[in-house]
Amino acid sequence: YNVPSIEEFANRIKTTLKKYPYIVAELNGKIVGYAYAGVFKGRKAYDWSVETSIYIRLDNHGNGIGRRLYEKLEEILAKQGVTNVNACIAYTEHEDKHLHNDSVYFHKKLGYKTVGIFHKCAYKFDKWYDMIWMEKFIAEHNADPNDIIPYPMLNC
């Protein structure tokens, strides 16, 4: 696994912010986590669904930062017109120093449901990992949904 450069990471954030929120949590002036949404599938029919990502520094797990980030992220996404949030989570039957399964339990606590498992589809750290897809509905599925409001156009 290669850690992105600062420039690459900044470009990812800029690209995300063209359409979706990118939320950062700070504690005592240091970044301790972030959450954002991205395109779920690059076709018009899927505009109302997004893929979410979250990262919390390991030493800050369990203190509510992740919950607050996701609550804010989902609140903004619902205002944009998003109906479905999806999370693709690495999973292992036997936890190791690179991967624990806390993210699956975290998402379950926030109301996400497992909708699919891809077995041994991700290879990193010299090991095969499963991927679990989880989803949550954050808004009604109207018969004629409005277009998604890009994040920069939203008045939060």
Language-model segments: residues:
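Conserved GNAT-fold acetyl-CoA-binding loop/helix
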Residues: 1-14
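A short helix-loop-beta-strand connector motif used in the catalytic cores of GNAT acetyltransferases and
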Residues: 13-27
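Conserved beta-strand in the GNAT
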Residues: 24, 30-39
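A conserved beta-turn-beta hairpin within the catalytic core of GNAT-like acetyltransferases
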Residues: 40-52, 61, 78-84
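A short, internal acetyl-CoA/4′-phosphopantetheine-binding micro-motif in the GNAT/acyltransferase core
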Residues: 53-61, 89-94
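Conserved acetyl-CoA-binding loop-helix of GNAT-fold acetyltransferases
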Residues: 62-79, 100-105, 109
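Conserved GNAT acetyl-CoA-binding A-motif
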Residues: 77-102
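Conserved catalytic-core motifs of GNAT/GCN5-like acyltransferases
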Residues: 88-90, 104, 108-127, 139-140, ...
